[in-house]
């Protein structure tokens, strides 16, 4: 087994034995241990009491974090005519129709969010096996299949975060950068947790939020008391 670097070892020792912290305590600890040369992303992982293999237990949604993500989001838009022009004016990075489909089919995926007007879905539908596993498939439930292209592009660029439960019932996302003020990270964490709480599906039984953890890109994770994150 490879030896741990001094920085990694120190970070792990700093969080050893610490669990069920308040959001404020966890954020302070994460920031203190984010010592890489780049601005690490602060990430949240939530273990939910759901089985997303069942349709009535799927957790999916979108939330606009009050302080943004600190990430530059690249947006692709499937649109034609005036709507394509609207997307470009709103700041979309890539705009197209069949040409964009062919680019994606060739394996070139240079975007973080994909938006489409409803009339484009027959084309976009052919890309399901490529975009679906990457959580990039446009979906009306999260506002990425829409005629209001301008609003969708601006939301994506402005700190909107999509979330979806994975097979094990885990939802994860970036909620800011380690360089953010502690108060701003705390706000973002609580906004994300609140959105996941409101997305509780009808088929969820028993305890819904089982565990919440925060970490930075290169740092160890710490568990957060669910009550602290939800404000209960």
From Swiss-Prot:
- InterPro entries given in the database record: Ribosom_uL1_bac-type, Ribosomal_uL1, Ribosomal_uL1-like, Ribosomal_uL1/biogenesis, Ribosomal_uL1_3-a/b-sand, Ribosomal_uL1_CS
UniProt keyword annotations, A-Z = Repressor, Ribonucleoprotein, Ribosomal protein, RNA-binding, rRNA-binding, Translation regulation, tRNA-binding
| A single GO BP | regulation of translation
Q: Does the keyword Protease apply?
A: no
GO molecular function terms noted in the UniProt entry: rRNA binding; structural constituent of ribosome; tRNA binding
Please give the start and end residues of each transmembrane region.
none
Concerning Gene3D superfamilies, the annotation shows: 3.30.190.20, 3.40.50.790
Q: Which family does it belong to?
A: Belongs to the universal ribosomal protein uL1 family.
Task: Describe the protein's quaternary organization and the partners it interacts with.
Answer: Part of the 50S ribosomal subunit.
What is the recorded function of this protein according to its Swiss-Prot or TrEMBL entry? Binds directly to 23S rRNA. The L1 stalk is quite mobile in the ribosome, and is involved in E site tRNA release. Protein L1 is also a translational repressor protein, it controls the translation of the L11 operon by binding to its mRNA.
Name-wise, this protein is Large ribosomal subunit protein uL1
Q: What is the organism of origin for this protein?
A: Dinoroseobacter shibae (strain DSM 16493 / NCIMB 14021 / DFL 12)
State the gene name recorded for this protein. rplA
């Amino acid at each position: 087994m490879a030896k741990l670097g001094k920085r990694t070892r120190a970070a792990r020792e700093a969080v050893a034995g610490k669990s069920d912290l308040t959001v404020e305590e966890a954020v302070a600890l994460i920031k203190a241990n984010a010592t890489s040369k780049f601005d690490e992303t602060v990430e949240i992982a939530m273990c939910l009491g759901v089985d997303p293999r069942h349709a009535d237990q799927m957790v999916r949604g979108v939330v606009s974090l009050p302080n943004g993500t600190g990430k530059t989001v690249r947006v692709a838009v499937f649109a034609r005519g005036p709507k394509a022009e609207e997307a470009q004016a709103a700041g979309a990075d890539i705009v197209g129709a069949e040409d964009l489909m062919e680019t994606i089919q060739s394996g070139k995926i240079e975007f973080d969010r994909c938006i489409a007007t409803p009339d484009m879905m027959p084309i976009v539908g052919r890309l399901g096996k490529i975009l679906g596993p990457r959580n990039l498939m446009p979906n009306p439930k999260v506002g990425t299949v829409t005629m209001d292209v301008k609003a969708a592009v601006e939301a994506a660029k402005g700190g909107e975060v999509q979330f979806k439960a994975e097979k094990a019932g885990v939802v994860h996302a970036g909620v800011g950068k380690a360089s953010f003020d502690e108060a701003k990270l705390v706000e973002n964490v609580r906004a994300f947790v609140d959105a996941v709480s409101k997305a509780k599906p009808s088929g969820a039984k028993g305890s819904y939020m089982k565990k919440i953890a925060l970490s930075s890109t290169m740092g160890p994770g710490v568990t957060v008391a669910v009550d602290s994150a939800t404000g209960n």
